């Protein structure tokens, strides 16, 4: 059955939104994996666990926001298989933060690509929606992760375990 409310919402944009929803759910799944990795008894970094579990929740909420917009525009949500995280062992906080920045940059690029598609399709509602709810948040998160990465790299040296512990205690406990 076709939508009664669909107006100026191309099938290309609809498909791209569905792909972006999948990317957000995959990111949420990855952050959940990261969070519970740092919650393990042999890793035990509570602040790092909390940081990544909060990100998992934020990405799930982002997927839901996209799905709600899809329905409001008369599009159809088509769920795809969710790919498991690329790894099960995440190593150090430094390794995990590097992986997280790569993930966030890929999400940001997908958002920019969708925004460009919306502009090309003359869809100002989509562009405004992305600008209001996603693009600024992504830039701020990438900056925050970059700052965390810089601080971790400063602390990690010959005393890598101590540096990781201090970062977790002094930085992530206050986020």
Curated annotation (Swiss-Prot):
In horse spleen the light chain is the major chain. One of its GO terms (biological process) is intracellular iron ion homeostasis. The keyword Ribosomal protein does not apply. Stores iron in a soluble, non-toxic, readily available form. Important for iron homeostasis. Iron is taken up in the ferrous form and deposited as ferric hydroxides after oxidation. Also plays a role in delivery of iron to cells. Mediates iron uptake in capsule cells of the developing kidney. Delivery to lysosomes by the cargo receptor NCOA4 for autophagic degradation and release or iron. Oligomer of 24 subunits. There are two types of subunits: L (light) chain and H (heavy) chain. The major chain can be light or heavy, depending on the species and tissue type. The functional molecule forms a roughly spherical shell with a diameter of 12 nm and contains a central cavity into which the insoluble mineral iron core is deposited. Interacts with NCOA4. Belongs to the ferritin family. Residues 7-156 form the Ferritin-like diiron domain. Residues 54-61 are annotated as: Catalytic site for iron oxidation. Disulfide bonds: none annotated. This is Ferritin light chain. Keywords: Acetylation, Cytoplasm, Cytoplasmic vesicle, Iron, Iron storage, Lysosome, Metal-binding. It is found in: Cytoplasmic vesicle, Autophagosome; Cytoplasm; Autolysosome.
């Amino acid at each position: 059955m076709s939508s009664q409310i669909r107006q100026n919402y191309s099938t290309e944009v609809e498909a791209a939104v569905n792909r972006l929803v999948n990317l957000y759910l995959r990111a949420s799944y990855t952050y959940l994996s990261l969070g519970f990795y740092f919650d393990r008894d042999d890793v035990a970094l509570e602040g790092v666990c909390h940081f990544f579990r909060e990100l998992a929740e934020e990405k799930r909420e982002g997927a839901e926001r996209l799905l709600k917009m899809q329905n409001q525009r008369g599009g159809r949500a088509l769920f795809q298989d969710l790919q498991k995280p690329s790894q099960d062992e995440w190593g150090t906080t430094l390794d995990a933060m590097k992986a997280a920045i790569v993930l966030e940059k890929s999400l940001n690029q997908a958002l920019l690509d969708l925004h460009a598609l919306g502009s090309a399709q003359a869809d100002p509602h989509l562009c405004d929606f992305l600008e209001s709810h996603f693009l600024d948040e992504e830039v701020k998160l990438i900056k925050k992760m970059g700052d965390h990465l810089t601080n971790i790299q400063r602390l990690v040296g010959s005393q890598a375990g101590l540096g990781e512990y201090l970062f977790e205690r002094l930085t992530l406990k206050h986020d």
